[in-house]
Amino acid sequence: MSTEATPLRFLVVDDTEDIRDLMSRMVVRLGHLADQAADGVEAVEALTRHDYDIMLLDLTMPRMSGEDVVRWLRENPDRGVGLDVVIISAWAGEQRAVLQELGVTTVLPKPLRGQQLRDLIEEKKTRTPR
């Protein structure tokens, strides 16, 4: 339903398949593209192959946590150029200070609401004209 000529590209990272699918469907319904990763290792693999505009990232996952993905991005800044990292987690409160130190400015509670996603998209479009 977006009137934007160039869709944003999202990477949706969550170890719960239903949540990943739900967030991806929300993104696609708004006229954008969504790739999925089931954990941090898959996220890093995707980030090395593609450029994304926004990453919706869970914190607590097997193999590699969301926090570790953010650390990897800080160590590999060429992979995160223009990428907005948005933490989506029910448990982010106690990690907020660490996330802020790593440069994460947006932390949203699960479940992600449609209006929150629309707001993220509008903010990104405002900052990054396409």
Model-assigned labels for residue ranges:
Residues 58:
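Active-site residues of response regulator receiver
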Residues 51-53, 78-84:
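His-Asp phosphorelay/catalytic-motif detector in bacterial-type signaling
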Residues 86-88:
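Hydrophobic/aromatic residues positioned on beta-strands within the core alpha/beta folds
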Residues 21-29:
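Charged docking surfaces used in two-component/phosphorelay signaling
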Residues 61:
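Receiver (REC) domain active-site loop signature in two-component systems and cognate sites
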Residues 36-54:
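Acidic, metal-coordinating helix/loop segments flanking the phosphotransfer/catalytic sites
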Residues 112-121:
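C-terminal output helix
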